[in-house]
């Protein structure tokens, strides 16, 4: 299964903008500078729906790491399983054999060896098994699954997916077992109506960099808009309220060097979503 082919049409819907507020780290104001009386001016990003039709204008304003950190408790998901594995390897530890987050106590999600089993309220159980790589491919699995967590307000289980093309995310509906494929990490709005998916790989460009908004208060997640990005992109997203999200942004190096880009610091911006019905 190719996760990225399904998103190809979405990613070409519009060309990436280059908002000044997000492409360079903010410089500190002098200590004697007057406190601004109004919010800084916003940069804009135009977004499109699944057919490429205009779906609104996003506004971005500079934010801070402190503002992002204050919203940590609002994130219902633990650290991503793949990131825990990377952290263990980077610290010289052996990567855990089982990357699952703690499974729900109600027994509706079970790990049986390499297989994950989900039991929705209606319909048959959903079984996820790793897909082995082809004999002439690299060692390991082409597709692997780890339980990431639950979004009860949206009635979704979240699965971290590793593929031969890069990371992805799978949502499984806790009511019906219906699957929804995402490219990026999901962040659920405080009112449980919307889910923002962010995917970032600006350093190497090996996977798409984009963000997508889904409406999740109905029977199935519905794509509202999608936005492809260029030399900057959101690595993490945390909602402040029903229309504002603080983003941690990664940046590509001006030289295009991957190692240099990986060493650039994150910057922060607040995203204001267009009004939706």
Regions found by a protein language model. Name each.
Residues 78, 115-137, 164-181, 209-225, ...:
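Surface-exposed loop/turn elements that mediate protein-protein interactions on large endomembrane-trafficking
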Residues 14-17:
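Bacterial signal peptide processing site
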Residues 109-111, 148-154, 186-197, 236-245:
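Blade-terminus and WD-like Trp-Asp/Gly-His loop motifs, strongest in beta-propeller folds
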Residues 159-164, 197-209, 247-253:
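Beta-strand C-termini and the immediately following turn/loop, strongest in propeller blades
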Residues 1-12:
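Sec-dependent bacterial lipoprotein signal peptides
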Residues 30-157:
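Terminal domain-start segments
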Residues 235-277:
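Hydrophilic extracytoplasmic domains
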């Amino acid at each position: 299964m190719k996760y990225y082919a399904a998103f190809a049409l979405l990613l070409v819907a519009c060309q990436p903008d280059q908002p000044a507020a997000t492409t360079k780290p903010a410089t500190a104001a002098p200590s004697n500078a007057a406190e601004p009386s109004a919010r800084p001016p916003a940069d804009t990003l135009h977004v499109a729906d699944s057919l490429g039709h205009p779906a609104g204008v996003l506004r971005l304003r500079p934010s801070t790491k402190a503002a992002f950190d204050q919203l940590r408790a609002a994130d219902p998901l633990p650290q991503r399983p793949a990131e825990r594995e990377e952290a263990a390897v980077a610290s010289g530890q052996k990567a855990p054999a089982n990357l699952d987050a703690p499974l729900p106590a109600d027994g509706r999600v079970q790990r049986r060896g390499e297989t994950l089993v989900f039991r929705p309220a209606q319909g048959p159980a959903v079984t996820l098994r790793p897909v082995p790589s082809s004999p002439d491919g690299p060692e390991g699995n082409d597709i692997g699954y780890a339980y990431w967590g639950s979004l009860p307000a949206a009635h979704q289980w979240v699965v971290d997916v590793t593929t031969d093309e890069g990371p992805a995310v799978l949502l499984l509906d806790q009511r019906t077992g219906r699957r929804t494929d995402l490219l990026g990490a999901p962040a659920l709005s405080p009112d449980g109506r919307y889910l923002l998916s962010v995917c970032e790989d600006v350093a190497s460009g090996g996977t798409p960099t984009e963000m997508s908004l889904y409406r999740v208060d109905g029977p199935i997640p519905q794509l509202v808009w999608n936005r492809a990005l260029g030399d900057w992109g959101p690595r993490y997203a945390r909602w402040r309220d029903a229309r504002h999200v603080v983003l941690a942004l990664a940046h590509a190096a001006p030289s295009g060097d991957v190692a240099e880009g990986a060493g650039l610091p994150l910057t922060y911006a607040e995203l204001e979503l267009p009004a939706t019905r």
